[in-house]
């Protein structure tokens, strides 16, 4: 498994270190979505329930076991090695549409070849599907996509020429996050996939703050109705965004907002 592989490679690294190494310890989490939040991850590492902390203090001041803590995404650590070995010029030589570098895009959904694809930063979803995923699955026509996982919002196929990078989607109310892209087709509808995402957030909410705990539950009920109460949904979304204490609650309404904004035909 992955853990055994990592333990084997760490043993090799310690046996022949390229430099003085810090103490390295592997900790296995229970897989809760909330533990992707920086302070909830620290709570989990400390053996406690994964719940986000109120800030300040920030984890850079008071982190794991009360010590200043620097957190990195694993992909960041991977690219540090590549850039040191191959130099920055190599990394920045990749990219499209004015963006620089490479990204690991995790593509799932209605494509022929789902999986993790290493592609240039700034590639569009249409290019990613055609060049790296061998096109849409047979019998399916591209209809829409989540550009950044369940909370990254939803965009229609007509907006499939937007470069995918860290700040290119902000103006559309979406974000790329960890580049976990979900593609759906004309066999699906945006209402259902958005409701499915909200049900996921309801299940994964840690329950610490009311806007997220109650807001996700209320949103699922509203999204299950034949006719959406758009003014109430907008009010609920604003409350969740403004008052939730961590990114889960703040971003949970993004898919719902996207349907209201980009898929109005489904609400008639």
Specify the residue positions occupied by each region the protein language model found.
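Ferredoxin-type iron-sulfur electron-transfer modules in oxidoreductases and energy-metabolism complexes
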Residues: 8-22, 164-268
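Short, structural beta-strand-to-alpha-helix junction motif
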Residues: 123-128
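Short acidic/glycine-rich loop or secondary-structure boundary segments that cap or lie
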Residues: 115, 153-156, 192
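Active-site loop ensemble at the mouth of alpha/beta enzyme cores that anchors a bound cofactor
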Residues: 44-56, 158-175
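Short polybasic amphipathic segments
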Residues: 105-108, 143-145, 181
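Hydrophobic alpha-helical positions that pack around
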Residues: 3-121, 133-136
């Amino acid at each position: 498994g992955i853990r055994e592989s990592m333990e084997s490679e760490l043993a090799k690294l310690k046996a022949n270190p390229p430099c003085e190494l810090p103490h390295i310890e592997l900790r296995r989490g229970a897989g809760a979505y909330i533990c992707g939040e920086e302070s909830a991850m620290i709570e989990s590492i400390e053996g406690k329930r994964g719940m986000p902390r109120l800030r300040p203090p920030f984890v850079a001041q008071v982190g794991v076991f009360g010590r200043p803590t620097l957190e990195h995404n694993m992909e960041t650590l991977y690219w540090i090695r590549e850039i040191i070995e191959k130099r920055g010029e190599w990394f920045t030589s990749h990219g499209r549409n004015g963006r620089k570098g490479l990204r690991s895009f995790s593509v799932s959904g209605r494509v022929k070849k789902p999986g993790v694809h290493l592609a240039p930063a700034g590639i569009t979803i249409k290019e990613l599907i055609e060049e790296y995923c061998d096109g849409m699955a047979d019998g399916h026509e591209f209809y829409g996509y989540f550009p950044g996982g369940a909370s990254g919002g939803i965009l229609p196929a007509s907006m499939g020429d937007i470069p995918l990078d860290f700040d290119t989607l902000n103006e559309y109310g979406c974000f790329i996050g960890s580049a976990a892209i979900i593609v759906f087709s004309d066999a699906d509808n945006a209402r259902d996939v958005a409701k499915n995402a909200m049900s996921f957030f309801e299940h994964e909410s840690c329950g610490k703050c009311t806007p997220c705990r109650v807001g996700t539950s209320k949103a699922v009920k509203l999204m299950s109705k034949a006719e959406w109460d758009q003014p109430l949904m907008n009010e609920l979304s604003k409350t969740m965004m403004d008052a939730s204490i961590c990114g889960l609650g703040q971003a949970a309404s993004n898919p719902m907002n996207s349907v209201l904004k980009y898929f109005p035909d489904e609400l008639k």
